[in-house]
């Protein structure tokens, strides 16, 4: 029978609930328990697909094509378990479902209310995750902060959930802040006490407190919070700031978080096997060399907009025994200045995805710089499209070449709208999304990196390489090394006369894992370090549901 864990947050936002939930998932999985993690987001958007990266950060795409919160990326990377659209729920999607039911007459003329109808829909979504994959444990993270108006229906739903499954099959974890007050020279528990008081006023008594702090809790503080918050001293868990998020599972293991959870849920206490994770963290913390990679993007003022990209580079660098240094470069700066000012000295360049014309010419300039100076280059989604635009303008001599997305009147639309997108009106959830197969050309760099003839990768785009220019592209020395199985859609392009120049239409960053660095990122880092690419051992990618 599935057990349920609910993770709430108090005192401040961005307190790290997602990392705590993901870390707990890793600790339970290391004990042989299967885990699925669900995120409840209180915003009214149906999904984050149309939200600005500056508002929301990265949009993480699941294998089944859901556009979700970046926390699902943490869940997948920490647990090495693919999530689905069932693992992402927003207030908007809940209200949309309830209103659709009302329009169909499912409520038999009754008055539709937050309680019981909205809360019942929320509970049903949680049950659905358990029914879909039958995990041993479902961990649910509730977005927002206790006390927010937006979160109240979710909190009420998880309070009611106790009646659905019984007290022995459910645990509440509250992540809170214990700040250090410099003027007083001590840490304060009062914010935690008030946060728990707010939670208890809703009818939820936390079983475990996870206390975020920048230093070890002072003597007697666990006992004090235990007494005031009505939890056992052993259930007051310290979560001290770490140099890397990947240290957090090991820190929480030392604090006994998993043991407390298993006790509450009356599950068997098993010995964890964290050997692989410990080895990975040791690699991360003890590199013998250094590599610097530039990420040239249009949303670099918020690094979370490219979270999976930076983490994928980190996975690959650690596996190559290298300390990763990231140089964040605003693509717009390259439109008005000399690219060398921003890119000189880097070992590799990544141009990630994005939408809209702003900064695209800067991305093209970065790619031309990488091509001219033989710097290892990896393009992702829009990064591939920008590489094609660079080829068209600067190699093939097609004046005015562009993407039809940015210039509908361009004389050379080397990037064009997918045929199936021609009549699409709505923006949300209508792109080419999720896992798609890709056929790899024998003897190509892509084939050397993947070690496979057919791969599956996640997509999020409306525009593709215009096949009217494919022959000219090939004649000018470039290679189309990956296509859809019917050869209609160009998925990977390369420049064979370059040490490492490869770009893909998909998003490989969504399937990179600490223990399985993605082959494209692994290849980039190897090339950036000057290593022989023949030594790249094709890493098996996580199993996906095709």
Swiss-Prot record:
It holds the Pfam family GATase. Allosterically activated by GTP, when glutamine is the substrate; GTP has no effect on the reaction when ammonia is the substrate. The allosteric effector GTP functions by stabilizing the protein conformation that binds the tetrahedral intermediate(s) formed during glutamine hydrolysis. Inhibited by the product CTP, via allosteric rather than competitive inhibition. This is CTP synthase. It comes from Synechococcus sp. (strain ATCC 27144 / PCC 6301 / SAUG 1402/1). The keyword Ligase applies. Its EC number is 6.3.4.2. InterPro entries: Class_I_gatase-like (IPR029062), CTP_synthase (IPR004468), CTP_synthase_N (IPR017456), GATASE (IPR017926), GATase1_CTP_Synthase (IPR033828), P-loop_NTPase (IPR027417). Catalyzes the ATP-dependent amination of UTP to CTP with either L-glutamine or ammonia as the source of nitrogen. Regulates intracellular CTP levels through interactions with the four ribonucleotide triphosphates. UTP binds at residues 13, 188-193, 224. Mg(2+) binds at residues 71, 141. GO terms for cellular component: cytosol.
């Amino acid at each position: 029978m599935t057990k349920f864990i609910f993770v709430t947050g108090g005192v401040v936002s961005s307190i790290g609930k997602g990392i705590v939930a993901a870390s707990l998932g890793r600790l339970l999985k290391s004990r042989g328990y299967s885990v699925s993690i669900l995120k409840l987001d209180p915003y009214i958007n149906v999904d984050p697909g149309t939200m600005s990266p500056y508002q929301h950060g990265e949009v993480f795409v699941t294998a089944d094509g859901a556009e979700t919160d970046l926390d699902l990326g943490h869940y997948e990377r920490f647990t090495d378990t693919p999530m689905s659209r069932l693992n992402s729920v927003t207030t908007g999607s809940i209200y949309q479902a309830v209103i659709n039911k009302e329009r169909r007459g499912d409520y038999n003329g009754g008055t539709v209310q937050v309680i019981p109808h909205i809360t019942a829909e929320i509970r049903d979504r949680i049950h659905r995750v358990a029914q879909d994959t039958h995990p041993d444990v479902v961990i649910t993270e509730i977005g927002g902060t206790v006390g927010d108006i937006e979160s109240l229906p979710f909190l009420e739903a998880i309070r009611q959930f106790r009646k659905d499954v019984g007290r022995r099959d459910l645990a509440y974890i509250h992540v809170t802040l214990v700040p250090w007050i410099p003027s007083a020279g001590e840490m304060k528990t009062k914010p935690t006490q008030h946060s728990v008081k707010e939670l208890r006023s809703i009818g939820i008594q936390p079983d475990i407190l996870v206390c975020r702090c920048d230093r070890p809790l002072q003597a007697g503080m666990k006992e004090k919070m235990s007494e005031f918050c009505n939890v056992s001293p052993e259930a007051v868990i310290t979560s001290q700031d770490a140099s890397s998020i990947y240290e957090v599972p090991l820190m929480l293991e030392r604090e006994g978080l998993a043991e407390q959870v298993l006790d509450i849920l009356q599950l068997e206490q098993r010995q964890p096997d964290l050997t692989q994770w410990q080895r990975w963290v040791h690699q991360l913390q003890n590199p013998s060399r250094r590599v610097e990679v530039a990420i040239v993007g249009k949303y670099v003022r918020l690094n979370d907009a490219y979270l999976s990209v930076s983490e994928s580079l980190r996975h690959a660098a650690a596996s190559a025994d290298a300390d990763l240094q990231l140089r964040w470069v605003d693509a717009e700066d390259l439109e008005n200045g000399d690219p060398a000012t921003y890119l000189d000295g880097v070992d590799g360049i990544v141009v990630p995805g994005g939408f809209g014309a702003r900064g695209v010419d800067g991305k093209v300039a970065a790619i031309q710089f990488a091509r001219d100076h033989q710097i290892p280059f990896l393009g992702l989604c829009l990064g591939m499209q920008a590489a094609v635009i660079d080829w068209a303008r600067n190699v093939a001599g097609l004046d005015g070449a562009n993407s039809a997305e940015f210039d509908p009147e361009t004389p050379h639309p080397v990037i064009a709208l997918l045929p199936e997108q021609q009549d699409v009106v709505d923006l949300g959830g209508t792109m080419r999304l999720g896992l798609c197969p890709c056929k790899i050309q024998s003897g190509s760099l892509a084939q050397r990196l993947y070690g496979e003839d057919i791969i599956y990768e996640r997509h999020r785009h409306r525009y593709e390489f215009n096949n009217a220019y494919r022959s000219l592209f090939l004649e000018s020395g470039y290679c189309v090394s990956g296509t859809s199985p019917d050869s209609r859609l160009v998925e990977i392009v390369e420049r064979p006369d370059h040490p490492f120049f490869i770009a893909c239409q998909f998003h490989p960053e969504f399937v990179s894992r600490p223990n399985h660095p993605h082959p494209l990122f692994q290849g980039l880092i190897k090339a950036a370090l000057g290593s022989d690419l023949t030594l790249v051992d094709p890493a098996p990618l996580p199993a996906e549901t095709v």
